[in-house]
């Protein structure tokens, strides 16, 4: 599902799949966000969790209270290819949420909740990440990050080299 926030300056769109930005368009119709091209990179602005980047051979060892567990983590983590739940929406703000599930627990043995809040004010988009460890007795290592890609060149009379 695609959800939009609009004001007098921008229209910003988001996808519940991945909980990510999918469009940033000015009132003049200029698209700022990369729209994806499978020839180069089909992504737009994925949310990376519980890792940013890759791990050696895709394999991670977790040192838990009850022993060592091995898991497989794909590049940039587990949530960028999952459906998020829309928890809140106003005319200028929305909040997505995702939690651990049986599939994520197989390779990342921590019960978590991730909330991503997007807020549009004027020409600014504020993104706030909130990560919750739902197990109080187990330390939960993680990274979280955004990976937005911006369109370049923006205008028809520009070249990539202009940037």
Name each model feature, range by range.
Residues 1-126, 134-163:
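Surface-exposed acidic/polar loop and edge beta-strand patches at domain peripheries
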């Amino acid at each position: 599902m695609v959800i939009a926030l609009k004001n007098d300056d921008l229209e910003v769109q988001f996808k519940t799949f991945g909980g990510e930005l999918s469009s940033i368009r000015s009132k003049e119709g200029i698209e700022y966000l990369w729209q994806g091209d499978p020839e180069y990179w089909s992504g737009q602005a994925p949310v990376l969790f519980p890792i940013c980047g890759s791990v050696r051979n895709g394999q991670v060892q977790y040192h838990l209270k009850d022993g060592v567990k091995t898991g497989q983590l794909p590049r940039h983590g587990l949530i960028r290819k999952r459906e998020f739940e829309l928890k809140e929406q106003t005319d200028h703000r929305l909040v997505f949420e995702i939690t651990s599930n049986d599939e994520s627990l197989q390779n990342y043995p921590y019960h978590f909740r991730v909330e991503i809040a997007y807020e549009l004010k004027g020409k600014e988009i504020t993104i706030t990440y909130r990560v919750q460890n739902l197990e109080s007795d187990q330390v939960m290592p993680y990274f979280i990050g955004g990976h937005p890609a911006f369109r370049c060149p923006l205008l028809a009379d520009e070249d990539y080299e202009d940037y």
